[in-house]
Amino acid sequence: MIYPSPYPDVVIPETTVTTHVFGSTEESDTRTALIDGPTGATTSYGELAGAIRRAAGGLAARGFAKGDVLGIYSPNTVLYPIAFHGAAYAGGVVTTVNPHYTAGELASQLRDAGARFLVTTSACVEKAREAAEEAGGIEEIFSFDDAPGTTPFSALTDGAELAEGPQMNPSTDLVALPYSSGTTGGSKGVMLTHRNLVANMVQLDGSESLSRGLTEDDTVLAVLPFFHIYGLLVIMNWALSQRARIVVLPRFELETFLGAIQDHGVTYLHVVPPILLAMAKHPIVDQYDLSSLDAINSGAAPLGKELGLAVEERLDCIVGQGYGLTETSPVTHHGPNKRRGQCPHGSIGPSLPNTETQIVDVDSGAALGPGERGEVWIRGPQVMLGYLNRPDATAETLDEDGWLHTGDIGYIDENGYGYIVDRLKELIKYKGFQVAPAELEALLLSHPHIKDVAVVRSPDPEAGEVPKAFVVADGELSADDVMSFVAGKVAPHKKIRRVEFVDEIPKSPAGKILRRVLVEREEGRA
């Protein structure tokens, strides 16, 4: 059974990302585009568009041409959009890199992507230099903040503008090359075209009949990293395409984050569940005026029903969630959020315009009906071309009919709303029964004395695997308390069988639980 979008199809313009976002923006446009969170300095849309054209000119003067790759290895900064769009306007491809990567990890990505130039910051410059030498092929390193031994990024923006970029085919020419472990393990370059990104922005626009869209009256807080596809497309590019204001923070620190919402009157917030957890439970939240917040959208990891409701009630604003992957540019589903209660908490909502969904039995491959759980398959114009230099991994993930096999387990209810249960490869097999860690985590987070939690498989000689909870406690709590709390609320095979108290849960910069770290620890003890 194929589940279509409830929204009418939208027309996807055959244009490049930079043209779609900025169009014919003139330097006389004084509307504020970017606000530097730490300093309060502002950049207008006119200034931003001019800087992008000059950055493109600076790159072109260095021989950067259509199809060439620029790496960005940096935390969030107001200069990030200039680097991204400067390269894009010049016809290039941008590979975004996690600034927490080691020199070896950075070198591996630069080498695989075939990068010619690299942009970084003082905080990352030593690793950048080491990686560039190891990778080979890097002709010049630029730094946003004039790090010693690099070319100042301003050298690209001080010269003449590139009057016109090269002729591009939006459907086949790449513009972004983020890296993802995907559904098959191992970091791989995700080939995203101009059309992929433009399509996803237009799809987000086209879901406004049920969802609260962005306008030039909105102020968005960019605390999630731009190197991640969620930050790059949804926070940075979609917001700029709608002429909203973006307050840019380099990292998440709770008090700085709350202060930015208060000081800049943030109206629309994109976060991940760990940030919502702090907003729901941390007492310091009450010290800030967050009344400007109108809508909060959560992504990158499943948001439990109880947590979403707790934040909504505490802050008196709409909390919803979306769903997607790096491989889908990223958004495929979004919960309607024009009013509270419009979308059931825990649901990712319906699919975006032009997007189809299937739920498929993981064993038989049969298409499933409403309420039946299986692997989520997606088809739409936001789906990637494939993985760079990895035809094997591409074939495992993208079938000949254009369906992307996500590796996520979920279901569609009778109203066409989607729910994500867990990752296929993260399911726990207890005596042959499947147990979804995310379901148990959402339940455990509703406990008043559990600050954070991760559930993983733990080897067991009798059951094969049992669910084990790693718990960050907030107050007096015993292992028996944790197990009994869950036992009364789930089927027997889903009970937590082991508990370990820890100081923190390992997570990626995007807020996803690093289960493999905990699983490897468990397997090492077996």
Question: Which role fits each region the language model picked out?
Answer:
Residues 5, 41, 126-171, 186:
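ANL superfamily adenylate-forming
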Residues 30-77, 81-85, 102-107:
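Conserved AMP-binding/adenylate-forming core of the ANL superfamily
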Residues 198-219, 227-267, 282:
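Conserved AMP-binding/adenylation subdomain of ANL enzymes
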